[in-house]
Amino acid sequence: MNTTPVHALTDIDGGIAVDPAPRLAGPPVFGGPGNDAFDLAPVRSTGREMLRFDFPGVSIGAAHYEEGPTGATVIHIPAGARTAVDARGGAVGLSGGYDFNHAICLAGGAGYGLEAGAGVSDALLERLEHRTGFAELQLVSSAVIYDFSARSTAVYPDKALGRAALEFAVPGEFPQGRAGAGMSASAGKVDWDRTEITGQGAAFRRLGDVRILAVVVPNPVGVIVDRAGTVVRGNYDAQTGVRRHPVFDYQEAFAEQVPPVTEAGNTTISAIVTNVRMSPVELNQFAKQVHSSMHRGIQPFHTDMDGDTLFAVTTDEIDLPTTPGSSRGRLSVNATALGAIASEVMWDAVLEAGK
């Protein structure tokens, strides 16, 4: 779907092919030529298709190195926006983690890919002609996925790639699929022979004046599951043509009294952006609510073999109507309702990444 009109809640569908074609990642190499071995040139990522969204003040750019392949995706909010960070799992790759950001950088390359965020910071400083007044500081937070297992090089997103992703940023467009940070994302790592390539995904909803944009790069040990409970990406058995939920592999292992097999090197990174003003407590709870909801579309999620990070961002542009009965202590029913809707938008984004 290239355009997203104003939606009612009942219009959230998250449609995806019932039996998408297999996209096996192949066995990992865990090494190979690095950045210095190539004459690297950033490429603008266009992906499978372009999502069009209507969110003034928010631009997105994606760039990649074909030699990786690996990439970076930048969400740029020039005016800056308050941010809550929810990080879970056993191996989180995160820098910044600020409560106010001008850009969010998502990248491949594991910890090395955090350099892409430094490139975004450098570029923003140059745009301000190197002014460094405290109120003018440009804040960038970054999160990375471990994508080396799905490719045969040690190339990682560096400063030049982060700069390029920022330069490519435009309002109202997001490249779906194998693009930016999702170039070599994968899912279903019960066994390397059954791991499938995913990508990056986004979804957008507008409800009256309320805007919600979800962006995700699923690279989990788990599989991607649709709303019917069907595994649509990951843990694909080429001999049978069946995608299995990992729970069946784990059950068989316990029944046979052998350790369950699960491969390491997994992460899902995401951002949920809205224009609704929330208190700091509400924004933090909003982040937790949406992040927790993602276990429906990614199973299992937040494991010791993952390092999941979600950025919840608000541009603080509109206030939802309130009534004396709409709050419980410090938390508003409005924020809870917004989180419920945003959770569905995020599930749509996860499914887009799995197409």
From Swiss-Prot:
It comes from Paenarthrobacter ureafaciens. Coiled coil: none annotated. GO terms for biological process: nylon catabolic process. InterPro entries: ArgJ-like_dom_sf, Peptidase_S58_DmpA. Belongs to the peptidase S58 family. This is 6-aminohexanoate-oligomer endohydrolase. One of its GO terms (molecular function) is aminopeptidase activity. Heterotetramer composed of 4 alpha/beta heterodimers. Exists at the monomer/dimer/trimer equilibrium in aqueous solution. Expressed as an inactive precursor that is cleaved autocatalytically at Asn266/Thr267 to generate an active enzyme composed of an alpha subunit and a beta subunit. Involved in the degradation of nylon-6 oligomers. Degrades cyclic and linear oligomers of 6-aminohexanoate (Ahx) with a degree of polymerization greater than three by an endo-type mode. Cannot use Ahx cyclic dimer or the Ahx linear dimer. CDD domains: DmpA_OAT.
